Amino acid sequence: GYLLRHKKSGARIALLSNEDENKVFYIGFKTPPADSTGVAHILEHSVLEGSKEFPVKDPFIELVKGSMNTFLNAMTYPDKTMYPVASCNDKDFANLMHVYMDAVFYPDIYKQPNIFYQEGWHYEMENASDELKLNGVVYNEMKGAFSSPDDVLDREIVRNLFPDTVYANESGGDPDVIPNLTYEQFLDFHRKYYHPANSYIYLYGNMDMVERLNWMDEHYLSHFEKIDVEANISLQEPFAAPREAVKPYSITENEPLEHNTYLTCSMTAGDVLNREEYIAFQILDYALCSSQGAPLKQALLDAGIGEDIYSDYDNGTRQPYFSIVAKNADASRKEEFLRIIDETLEKLVAEGLDQKRLQAGLNYYEFKYREADYGIFPAGLMYGLQVMDSWLY
C-alpha cells in the first residue's frame, strides 16, 4: 500500500493495490460539527442531488437503478463524512468515481436552493386553512432516530463523555435544532470543508492505479490550490471525578415504567492512534463481556440487574470509549450496578483474567480478520473504513 499527498491540492490518497476484482473507492472529509443543526448530514444528502457534469435530479437513484455496483452509499459520522462506492466492472467503477467526485466538488446546491430545503427542512401546508408544519428528508430521518431508545443512549454517552469537544454536537442533526440552519450556513460548510486539502481518498483492488491517479489529477485535483482547512478535533480533558447524567426517553402507552431503564457505565479507553491498545480493548471486551459466561456480564446477570447486559468498545472517534449497559433495569439499582462493576474489575485485576478466555478472544479476532467475511459488504470497503479510524487524526 501507499500513502500519497497531491502536491497542488493537498489531497491525501491511500492506495491498496491487489488482485481483488471488487474495487473500492471513497472520498471522505473531516467535518467536525460546530452545532446540532445537522449541516454535515444535510450536505451528505444534498451533494448527490445533481452536479456540474451530472445535472440530473437524482444521480444517486440513477446509479442505484443502472449501475453494477456492489456498494453505493454515503455516510455521516460524528466527525467525518464519507462517500464510498464499489464495483467489479472497470467501466462502471470509473463512472461511479466520476459521479461521486463531481458531486462533492461541484454540486448543484449553489444554483438550486430547493435542494437544501428538500433535504434539510422547510415549512409546508396543503391548504390555507391547514396548520404550518415542518418537513424535510433529514429532519424526518432524525425524528425517527431520536425516538429510538438505543440511538438516544448512544448519543447521550458520547455527549456526556466528551462535553467540551465537537462530539457534544449531533452531526446527524437534532430535530429541535435543524430548523435553525440557514441556506447560507449550509453553503459555507461546503465551501470550508469540501476542499481536496481536507479530503481522504481511498482506492483498493485490481486496477491501473496510475491511470486512476492521473484521471483524478486532470479532472479534479489539479483545479484546486492547497489551503489550510481548520478542522481540528481536540481531546476531552479528563474529569476531576466521575459524572452522572440522566436522560428521559419516550415509551409507548403499553410499555411498563418498571424494568424499563437503561443503566450504563462508560469511560474513555486509550488513544485511537495506539494500534496495540485498539486490538487489546477489542479482546478485553470479548473476555469481560461479550463471550458466553464472561465474568463482568455474568456478575451483573447473576445479581438480576437487567434482563440483558452488553458492552460496546467504540473506536470511531478521536478518543475510543468503552460502555457496559444493563437493559430493562431499575433506576433504583444504579449504585448496585456500579458497585458490581467495580468489585468485579478489582477482583479480576487482583486474580488475573482467565487465560483461556483471553486466548479465545485472540483466536476470535485473528480468525475474523483473516477470514475477512463481511457478508454483503466488500472486504475492501471494510478495510477502508478501518483505515479512517486512525487516518483522520
Pin down the residues of each PLM region.
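Short acidic-hydrophobic surface loop/beta-edge motif
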Residues: Y2-K7, R243-E253
